[in-house]
Amino acid sequence: YAMHLLRTQDTQHVRVHPDGEHGKQFDFAAWLLRRDFIKISSIGTTSYGGTYRNAAGQEITVNPKSGLGDVVAEVGNHVISAECKGGIINTRHSGQVSRLYKGLCETVGMLMATPSQGRQVAVVPLTEGTRRLAERLAARCALAGIEIALVGARGEVMDVKPAGDNERVTGRRDE
């Protein structure tokens, strides 16, 4: 979702705050390097914590510190804060499908329990089930100031809008 914000919002800097387990399971440095981001400074004691910059001057800071929002960007004079939950998306196993459902509910709940600094977005993997649930939740979430975004297997991001909006689901591909 951090790459999506860099591509679609008027910002040059996005902060990512992974929890400890996410940092152990995901190679942030290699993933950013494949996207032409070079590490320019270090933060904390992890090998991946630090600020990364690409040739266009865009920066991603990876700081494994909890309580700050999973992905945060300042856009103009407001803040976009996203809570993200991952999961296995190419499965029909009932336990995994249930976990994806719970992940969406959990991200919405986390955002509701956090004071809003600006736009709040619940971000989960795109599956048929999460799309249906997101469409059902979208209107109530909008009343609470929470947006829902679903991320597909290839990085495409779909913003789920409440029924009645002109465009219910909008898709943008982010590789």
Residue ranges of predicted features:
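Hydrophobic anchor at the start of a short beta-strand
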Residues: 8-14, 119-121
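Active-site metal-binding core of divalent-cation-utilizing nuclease and nuclease-like domains
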Residues: 13-89, 100-103
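Conserved catalytic or regulatory cores that recognize and/or transform ribose-phosphate-containing ligands
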Residues: 69, 79-80, 138, 169-171, ...
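Active-site-adjacent loop/helix micro-motif of nuclease/hydrolase catalytic cores
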Residues: 89-107, 130-133
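Nucleic-acid nuclease catalytic cores
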Residues: 112-156
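Polybasic (Lys/Arg-rich)
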Residues: 147-175
